[in-house]
Amino acid sequence: MALIRLVAPERVFSDLASMVAYPNFQVQDKITLLGSAGGDFTFTTTASVVDNGTVFAVPGGYLLRKFVGPAYSSWFSNWTGIVTFMSAPNRHLVVDTVLQATSVLNIKSNSTLEFTDTGRILPDAAVARQVLNITGSAPSVFVPLAADAAAGSKVITVAAGALSAVKGTYLYLRSNKLCDGGPNTYGVKISQIRKVVGVSTSGGVTSIRLDKALHYNYYLSDAAEVGIPTMVENVTLVSPYINEFGYDDLNRFFTSGISANFAADLHIQDGVIIGNKRPGASDIEGRSAIKFNNCVDSTVKGTCFYNIGWYGVEVLGCSEDTEVHDIHAMDVRHAISLNWQSTADGDKWGEPIEFLGVNCEAYSTTQAGFDTHDIGKRVKFVRCVSYDSADDGFQARTNGVEYLNCRAYRAAMDGFASNTGVAFPIYRECLAYDNVRSGFNCSYGGGYVYDCEAHGSQNGVRINGGRVKGGRYTRNSSSHIFVTKDVAETAQTSLEIDGVSMRYDGTGRAVYFHGTVGIDPTLVSMSNNDMTGHGLFWALLSGYTVQPTPPRMSRNLLDDTGIRGVATLVAGEATVNARVRGNFGSVANSFKWVSEVKLTRLTFPSSAGALTVTSVAQNQDVPTPNPDLNSFVIRSSNAADVSQVAWEVYL
């Protein structure tokens, strides 16, 4: 026994084994353990939960470590003790050593887990497939609503005494109504988590006031019901570091690095999570680095993910108000995935609502860099970037996803894409560079593309309805805007193309109309577009058996010279050389069209008459026609008219 000195009641030990073996502790003793895991202790005979870090069993009682602030992993003799310590709420642990996880570590409410520069947790798939869990549970009992609760309402009602809800209680609402954020292929039903801010009872009915409005109608006809879940609240993970680089241990696969279910106010920052997927491989071991299921008010900031089998951050269930900032994901399936739930094994409830991703980067993902699967509402990505994805850079598989100032580089498919049954993603000031198929693909259900750019793809924009407004498109080999449908049963809707720069740069047409899939050009309007350099060949058509009617066109440019000037009428007429153009044939895969000439009278002699344009002619020089020799005639209804007339040529 290594008792160094004994000055009652002080007892000082040089090693842990000696301390826990000492048989004669008294309650009044002052006890000190030396060394890196040392500290001061008190002795008690009161039963305590032993974790071999802050509480030790000794002969006749227990030693309790005296400390203020966090506990340290270096205090604990094994992983099991850390699991025991963190199994209670209100814990604060600093991981300052390399830990081998032999089971999942459950984290409870009001707890913080911090990692130092030397702190790590290494998973061990032989005994634990998950690493960190922040997990509550769904209600075990549900009660029906007493009356319908409409979307936008912040009050629900139940029968008096049916639900033990008080201020601060969380509620979980659900019904048989299907989620409507996207195609919802699996038939997931609606649900939401809300917090009680007030309760009142009158006339046999309890009214419960909620902290936030409902997103859906909860109707009795849909079997709307409510229960009280067990929630884990207020958890913070600072610099979590899971796994290491440069290992050969194939047993370190994990299904989830950090998994949260029925949690609120969960915050993860500055972490590193490393999977065991072979570099570049598509195996699915290690499903998610971080997984939020039925969580509210969650954030991830400044965290890096590497070699994850599936997702960097996965969001599913009725998770709401989730924000992900400044993450970096390398060689994962998707950096961020808002995910569906399969109902093959039974009913599922909830879709992600109010998701925001900001300044996130995805590198060399094995599928789309950022994905939204099938359901979800009010989803937005801001200043996010995808590099070298093996599929799309960004994929919207739920309706109305909004992208602001995002960028996609060198995707194997589309820079930005939607999917079957998905309507109207919104792109604002986004950039797409050198993506194989298209910069922006809105051909599954329409979309809005505002002030964006696409360069170096087959098509700048593939679209079947909506709006392309502003922006610049270059080096797209087939066309800058391809009006098509990627799914035959998708309905074409009206399309506005306005103020777009599609100047000819040696490749491709300005606009391509895909008659093979039934595209009707009359549903398209084109105005204020710069198609300089395309000349007669601004449009490409295919698949039409008879010549279609062209789109509505106004103030588009085909040239930057020879399109404005002033003419003086002589005897009521002037012939003007200008770059007027037209196609007057009736070939099926072509439009019949002619330039629009705008006339503005500059002088008003007494002989002024009504002005018209006649006799548009195109130069036919062989082998190369000269567009500067094209001409049109301005004619006045008064043969004596000598007015000066300004003219402008548009398409």
From Swiss-Prot:
The record marks R472 as: Important for the adsorption and infectivity of phage. Gene3D superfamilies: Single-stranded right-handed beta-helix, Pectin lyase-like (2.160.20.10). Substrate binds at Q130, K177, N217, K291, E314, N339, W340, R378. It is found in: Virion. Its main location: virion. Signal peptide: none annotated. It holds the Pfam family K1-lyase_N. One of its GO terms (molecular function) is lyase activity. The record marks Y311, H373, R397 as: Important for catalysis. GO terms for biological process: adhesion receptor-mediated virion attachment to host cell; symbiont entry into host cell via disruption of host cell envelope; symbiont entry into host cell via disruption of host cell glycocalyx. Changing E314A: 50% loss of enzymatic activity. Functions as a receptor binding protein (RBP) and mediates the attachment to the host capsular exopolysaccharides. Displays a lyase activity that specifically degrades the K1-type polysaccharides of Klebsiella pneumoniae capsule. This is Depolymerase, capsule K1-specific. It comes from Klebsiella phage NTUH-K2044-K1-1 (Bacteriophage NTUH-K2044-K1-1). The lineage of its organism: Viruses, Duplodnaviria, Heunggongvirae, Uroviricota, Caudoviricetes.
